[in-house]
Regions:
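Class I (Rossmann-like) S-adenosyl-L-methionine-dependent methyltransferase catalytic domain
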Residues: 1-42, 59-67, 77-146
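A conserved beta-strand element that flanks and buttresses the S-adenosyl-L-methionine
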Residues: 48-49
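Helix-to-beta-strand junctions that scaffold the AdoMet/dcAdoMet cofactor pocket
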Residues: 56-57, 72-73
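Hydrophobic adenine-recognition pocket in adenosine-nucleotide-binding enzymes
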Residues: 52
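Conserved acidic residues
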Residues: 45, 74
Length: 146
């Protein structure tokens, strides 16, 4: 099989290539591409999209899930910052203060919308986990076609 990896940032793609080389990955085993998600195309056994949806509001994120699912033959794995009422409240309070933004620009997403978008493309969730770090948490969902 083959592996394709992409990132919007050409610098991140170069860093990924460098690190892959340090890990013993031979040139050509992974194809690296600097691209936005909207431009990606092809067919893959598994499509993985991690820590990207913080840049997408709900509706565009759901559209992107459908786009990624259209490229996935069997598996789709995504992560996103889940919507919580407390975080929404804190973000709203931060927007009340004048001057440079005191609020995060990261979008939080409703899980039911992400699951519905994947379901519309023929995928069902088979595993869910919550990844927690001191100042960040994300929901990871693995989907299978069928």
């Amino acid at each position: 099989g083959s592996i394709a990896a992409s990132d919007l940032s050409a610098a991140m793609v170069q860093e990924a290539e460098r690190r892959a080389g340090e890990l013993g990955v031979k040139p050509g085993q992974i194809s690296f591409l600097a691209s936005d998600l909207e431009s990606l195309e092809g067919r893959y056994d598994t499509v993985i999209c991690l820590d990207v949806f913080i840049h997408y509001p709900q509706q565009p994120a759901e559209e992107m899930v459908r786009h990624l699912a259209a490229m996935a033959e069997r598996h789709l794995i995504v992560s996103f910052a889940p919507y919580t009422p407390l975080l929404a409240l804190l973000k709203g309070i931060g927007q009340l203060f004048p001057g440079p933004s005191k609020t995060t620009r990261a979008y939080t997403l409703r899980e039911d919308g992400i699951v519905a978008a994947a379901a519309a493309a023929g995928f069902k969730p088979v595993r869910r986990s919550l990844n927690q770090a001191p100042f960040y948490f994300s929901r990871l969902i693995a989907f299978e076609r069928g």
